[in-house]
Amino acid sequence: MKKLTKSFFFILFFLFLNFVSADEINRGLEIALKADNSFSGYGDSKTNLKMLLKDRKGSITERVMKMNLLEVPEDGDKSLIVFESPRDVRGVAVLSHAHKTGSDEQWLYLPALKRVKRVASKNRTGPFLGSEFSLEDLSFQEVEKYSYEYLREEVLEEKECDVIKRIPLDPYSGYTKQIVWVSKMDPLIYQIHHYDRKSFHFKTQIFRGYTKYLNKFWRPNEIHMINH
């Protein structure tokens, strides 16, 4: 009878743990969807961007680019990034077709070679043009491409945030997981910790200066990617 009681207790305890886990997963997904909705609905947009690369000695290199975005709700958003300066990267272009399921598609145009190169899914993880951003970072982060788990509540720079974990479903992703801080008030993403294939926290992405355009669409004025 004691063995039966212990076994029954263990089963109930196991079911309780699974129930909590499922609840946290659903809550994490719900928060991710709210953050995605705050970005969605724009249709298409054009943006002028400036990238500042800072090395360990403090020297700064400036790059100027343009980005065109096209929203495709039934599949995944598309983007075209074209570098305008400095001279050594002028004309370099990245075309990204994100997909809600399956691998994203990316093409790289190199003016020196005068040809377009399709980027293999497993080759999108390294630093792009000497920056801390990878080609994977430059593609849209569709909600469906991750599994989620709610972790905790936490204050980040005086903002009350929900902290969630998302795990890429793409087997070729350069990340094993990402820890994401989403403001409770907005809800907007303010920070992401990126973990590499060895589960080491090697990059932190920070979003600052959110501005609302057309009284509807929130966009950060600055995105910092810090390599640890």
Question: Across the structure, where does each feature detected by a protein language model lie?
Answer:
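Bacterial N-terminal signal peptides that target proteins for export
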Residues: 1-9
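N-terminal mature ectodomain segment of secretory-pathway/periplasmic proteins
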Residues: 27-112
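Bacterial N-terminal signal peptides
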Residues: 8-18
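Gly/Pro-enriched, hydrophobic low-complexity segments
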Residues: 33, 84, 95-97, 105-109, ...
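Short amphipathic beta-strand and strand-loop transition segments with alternating hydrophobic
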Residues: 68-70, 149-155, 208-210
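Boundary at the C-terminal end of the N-terminal hydrophobic targeting segment
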Residues: 20-22
